[in-house]
Curated annotation (Swiss-Prot):
Keywords: Initiation factor, Protein biosynthesis, RNA-binding. The gene is eif2a. GO terms for molecular function: ribosome binding; RNA binding; translation initiation factor activity. This is Translation initiation factor 2 subunit alpha. Residues 12-83 form the S1 motif domain. The keyword Protein biosynthesis applies. It comes from Methanocaldococcus jannaschii (strain ATCC 43067 / DSM 2661 / JAL-1 / JCM 10045 / NBRC 100440). Belongs to the eIF-2-alpha family. PANTHER family: EUKARYOTIC TRANSLATION INITIATION FACTOR 2 SUBUNIT 1. GO terms for biological process: translational initiation. eIF-2 functions in the early steps of protein synthesis by forming a ternary complex with GTP and initiator tRNA. Heterotrimer composed of an alpha, a beta and a gamma chain.
Length: 266
């Protein structure tokens, strides 16, 4: 069970829930992030335009993403809207909820290894990790990418650090990302092809990471495609910039011309 630090959502929040009941005038939604709390979607907030039959749009058991319009904590009333949520907000909330559920199970496994309850885990480390990393799953993911050291500045016991890192490595398999771009180079020297090859070879040595791969292929004069395969976009972008800047600097030093640019993967 997840214990929210806030008993009620706030006006403007995007929440996720399950439809528990549908009446002619509206639908009642169990809020998954706030156990024991229900919100109501009035028929006028289901969709834009006139709604003849609300059951054509909302069904019992349906998972919905809604925007909080009003909250009356004294009465326990929470008014929601479906029509005021964008498609992008829906996708983001569903993804956030899936990540949260997975992270919560990981935290529970870590707690079990220490003979603690999930509630104790949240109180001792869960909320702290959320505050530091933005969301719990991001904390576990960062541990896998950067190591247990990312927890060093936090007031977390060594036993918690060890077990959190252990569970993170057991649970998360990182998927590599690709960063692509193009280098354009020209050389006016008699041995211009040799100079361009030298610039590209030198550029490859600018990659400082063992877990990042760089591929450079010929497209057609004067273009060369650069593909950086990395565990995350941050290191991928960093290596792409280092490699391309090194290639351009080298060819210019040899009397040629060079430039580079990012290219979105189709």
């Amino acid at each position: 069970m997840f214990i929210m630090r806030r008993e009620f959502p706030e006006e403007g929040d995007i929440v996720i829930g399950t439809v528990k009941d549908v009446k002619p005038y509206g639908a009642f939604v169990e809020l998954l992030e706030y156990p024991g709390k229900e919100g109501m979607i009035h028929i006028s907030e289901v969709t834009s335009g006139w709604v003849k039959n609300i059951r054509d749009h909302v069904k019992v058991g349906q998972r919905v993403v809604a925007k909080v319009l009003r909250v009356d904590e004294r009465k326990g009333h929470i008014d929601l809207s479906l029509k005021r949520v964008t498609e992008q907000q829906k996708r983001a909330k569903v993804q956030e909820w899936k990540r949260f559920q997975r992270a919560s199970k990981m935290l529970e496994r870590a707690a079990e290894k220490l003979g603690k309850s999930l509630e104790e885990a949240w109180e001792e480390v869960g909320y702290l990790l959320e505050d530091e990393f933005g969301e719990l799953y991001n904390a576990f993911e960062t541990m896998v990418i950067e190591g247990k050291e990312v927890l060093d500045d936090l007031e977390i016991s060594e036993e918690w650090k060890n077990v959190l890192y252990e569970v993170a490595k057991e649970s998360i398999e990182l998927t590599n990302v690709e960063v692509e771009g193009v280098i354009e180079m020209k050389s006016y020297a008699p041995d211009g092809i040799k100079q361009i090859k030298k610039a590209l070879t030198t550029a490859l040595k600018a990659n400082p990471y063992e877990d990042v791969e760089v591929k450079i292929t010929y497209i057609g004069a004067p273009k060369y495609r650069v593909v950086v395969i990395a565990p995350d976009y941050k290191s991928g972008e960093e290596v792409f910039k280092k490699v391309c800047e090194k290639a351009v600097a080298t060819i210019k030093k040899l009397g040629g011309e060079g430039t580079y640019y990012r290219e979105s993967k189709k």
